[in-house]
Amino acid sequence: MTLDDLDELWRALDRIATTPRLLVACDFDGGLAPDLGDPDDARAEQLSSEALNILLALRDTTVAVVSRRDPEQVAQLMRLSGAKGGLRHVGPQHVDGLRDEVDATGVIRVSAVDERPQPLRPGDLAITVLNDGPADGVPGYVVADTEDVAEVLEEVARLRRGT
């Protein structure tokens, strides 16, 4: 990602962070947790979990982990503190349904490059995590890895808190 791309992503985060009701939906595998070869060893990045804890505590902000895995397994791998109760778990095909359920006015959708998320609505923000995958034809903004996702989530949390 070039410096200009990063500036553009940060401006997009500034815009969407002000939406009245935000849904942050992140793929677990490849979005929050790096692919280490063995899916049972996958753990969410610590900084991502911390940022999600902050977002979970904010009013009018819904956080969802998107995964085909069993919700109990994902919960164990997330490294979340007491805020686990507010975390939503949905399959990739159910993000739109959750958006409607919580009446979100904006969505940040973080997806791994090997996933093809459903198209977003105007004003939503797509972030694709390459994880050494190809960047050709991927939707939205592109970040290199799960550590970059952690930075994005920290920025969203900071902006939503107003600090």
Where are these regions (language model features)?
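A short acidic (Asp/Glu
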Residues: 36, 74-77, 120
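Non-catalytic pre-domain segments flanking phosphatase-related domains
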Residues: 1-28, 32-36, 79, 157-163
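Active-site neighborhood of HAD-like aspartate-dependent phosphohydrolases
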Residues: 15-63
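C-terminal cap/substrate-recognition subdomain and adjoining C-terminal extension
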Residues: 91-163
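Flexible, glycine-rich phosphate/dinucleotide-binding loops
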Residues: 39-41, 72, 135
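Active-site phosphate-binding/coordination module
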Residues: 43-105, 112-115
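Glycine-rich beta-strand-to-loop/alpha-helix junction loops that act as flexible
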Residues: 28, 66-69, 131
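Amphipathic coiled-coil/heptad-repeat helices and related helical stalk/stem segments
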Residues: 8-9, 48, 94, 149
